[in-house]
Amino acid sequence: MIDCRYYQQNECRSCQWLEIPYSQQLTEKQYHLKQQLISINCDEAQWLAPFQSNEQGFRNKAKMVVSGSVERPILGILKNPNDPQNAIDLCDCPLYPTHFSAIFSILKDFIGRAGLVPYNIAKQKGELKYILLTESIATEKLMLRFVLRTENKLPLIRRELPKLLEKLPHLEVISINLQPQHAAILEGEQEIFLTEQQFLPENFNGIPLFIRPQGFFQTNPKVAAGLYASAQQWVAEFPIYNLWDLFCGVGGFGLHCAKALQEKWGKPIKLTGIEISSSAILAASHSAKILGLEHVNFQSLDAASVIENKNENKPDLVIVNPPRRGIGKELSEFLNQIQPHFILYSSCNAMTMGKDLQHLTCYKPLKIQLFDMFPQTSHYEVLVLLERKKIN
């Protein structure tokens, strides 16, 4: 069991499974996964051993509520948003790398120097709501975001920024996010960059990726790298030359698979990536350019739009990495119709994935693996490779 004083003192119970031995956590998650697939014929599927995480220090991102006073800011959580007296400082949370604690100490000093009054939800007063810190494992560079109510403190922040950069030279991206609403909403739409660099470079398995301020990126780099590595190893076994990556984000799955396929089969690979976020598409396209992948087309569209496009060349492989709601019946039925040889399904919600697999009646699972992206909790991710059933 992790030695966590916050848990022991009942100050933070985010890690609901902290008292369960790690091996038992994996056993229970694997059992839960199999229960979600109980109605799917997995007799021919290869069940790989769960991909394990480090038990602590595995997170590359900290999301800290700011409370307290400008002289003595508290970075952590509010057990009761309407009562700032219940604030818990989580700067020593064992889920973060140990060096994050020293960074938080420097940021507390910066808050005072810049006069960033912590926002008080009950009184609806103050400026600084959250501090969001992300680290690149590949470069050890940092992205720092201040979530503020208004732009009022921007001149003071700019004035104090050189001193902050002296103390934290690894800061690559610094931005202000404006969230003016009096509500427990993490971030607003407007991002003001204080650095020339707007993306944080990361690298998994030799694939350059770029973390953007308002975008999704996995918070457990070791397990994320393992997830992408498994994906590329699984698909590289087959002669696949045309693939779609739906819900592609910054391109992690598609780029890993396209690079591996091109190296294995020695032919150009056509990759089409679909993602609703335009900034994610910019990041994915930049990665493809660095890799020298020429036949790549990342488009800022809703993944459901592929259903309407009847003229696209039919893919050999479709990768889906949907949000928790899954891909749904309509997209599942569309995949049954166009019948790619393979579907690679990555899910953060095995329950909705199980329902989707029931709709994918033309497919059978070949490989299944659990990835423990969120140790100390009941959550996990799963990767399934599906093959089109042969017609007798």
Swiss-Prot record:
Gene Ontology molecular functions: 4 iron, 4 sulfur cluster binding; iron ion binding; rRNA (uridine-C5-)-methyltransferase activity
Record keywords, A-Z: 4Fe-4S, Iron, Iron-sulfur, Metal-binding, Methyltransferase, rRNA processing, S-adenosyl-L-methionine, Transferase
EC numbers: 2.1.1.189
Name this polypeptide is given: 23S rRNA (uracil(747)-C(5))-methyltransferase RlmC
Binding site for [4Fe-4S] cluster: 4, 12, 15, 93
Catalytic activity annotation: uridine(747) in 23S rRNA + S-adenosyl-L-methionine = 5-methyluridine(747) in 23S rRNA + S-adenosyl-L-homocysteine + H(+)
Source species taxonomy: Bacteria, Pseudomonadati, Pseudomonadota, Gammaproteobacteria, Pasteurellales
Family assignment from sequence similarity: Belongs to the class I-like SAM-binding methyltransferase superfamily. RNA M5U methyltransferase family. RlmC subfamily.
Organism: Haemophilus influenzae (strain PittGG)
Keyword Nucleotide-binding attributed: no
Active site: 348 (nucleophile)
Binding site for S-adenosyl-L-methionine: 218, 247, 275, 321
One GO term (biological process): rRNA base methylation
UniProt superkingdom: Bacteria
Gene name for this UniProt entry: rlmC
Family matches, as CDD domains: AdoMet_MTases
InterPro entries assigned to the protein according to its UniProt record, in alphabetical order: 23SrRNA_MeTrfase_RlmC, MeTrfase_TrmA_AS, MeTrfase_TrmA_CS, SAM-dependent_MTases_sf, U5_MeTrfase_fam
Pfam families per UniProt: tRNA_U5-meth_tr (PF05958)
Function as written in the Swiss-Prot or TrEMBL entry: Catalyzes the formation of 5-methyl-uridine at position 747 (m5U747) in 23S rRNA.
